[in-house]
Amino acid sequence: MCGLVFMGSKNIGYRDVEVFEEMLFCDTLRGSHSTGVCGIFEDKEHGTRNKLVKAAVPGPEFIASGFLDEAISIRTKNGNVTTIKRPIAAFGHNRYATKGEVNAVNAHPFTHDHITLAHNGTLTGQHRLIDHKKFEVDSENIAYSISKVGFVETLKNLDGAFTLIWHDSNLNTVNTIRNKERPFYLVRTSTNDWFGASEKEMLLWIMGRQKSPITIAEQFECEPGVQYVFDVTNGVFSFKEKVKHELPTFTRFPYSSSYSNFYGDDDYDYWTVS
């Protein structure tokens, strides 16, 4: 079990950063083996660029060590004045390792060419993805596949549980999609700030405990098979569209099962027909 957190806004301020930090901290309950954050910044030459920081430490240590601040700030110094530039969007991942060793290399997110991606879930049929033997971690294989053959072709071969968040620097978009085996919730505020997390109760609790009140305009669980697309062209964050996809189906024969837990998203073992 892993966890994902997300924020995006036309003007990310202190309160947004505080909410994101607290989400990343609490999301450690879903995975304490490693933590990673991708900050997406305006770039005058390319529209956007991202800054990726990850480490094999739990969320609280990631924050205390300054890794989070490194991922979501660009500092420039002019004499005695230091200017801090904030991202227009960011997503974070708290990993509980199911495939691959616990180290910074295997921490999420993963970058391949123009795709930077984080994944909650486990693929039972990684062999369906291109060049699968090259990758110890199935999640990195997903990022690689999207960078090579695109998201639509990759989706056809996603055999297993997933929620994905990824930044496409070619299209200048941030995207999320899930299947029914993994959760993800989004909240839009009255000022059109967006937040997301794997756990609804955690997300709403953190937003509700802020000193400066946050008014929620809408909240919802992402619909399975729907790609939520956020535009970050020219460094301006906005919701763009929802794209409905047909999720692939595979024949599976369960031969053992994990215990059920409160979250209802354990990993299971299957014989999968190729």
State where each predicted segment sits.
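Conserved short alpha-helical segments that host acidic/polar catalytic motifs at enzyme active sites
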Residues: 1-274
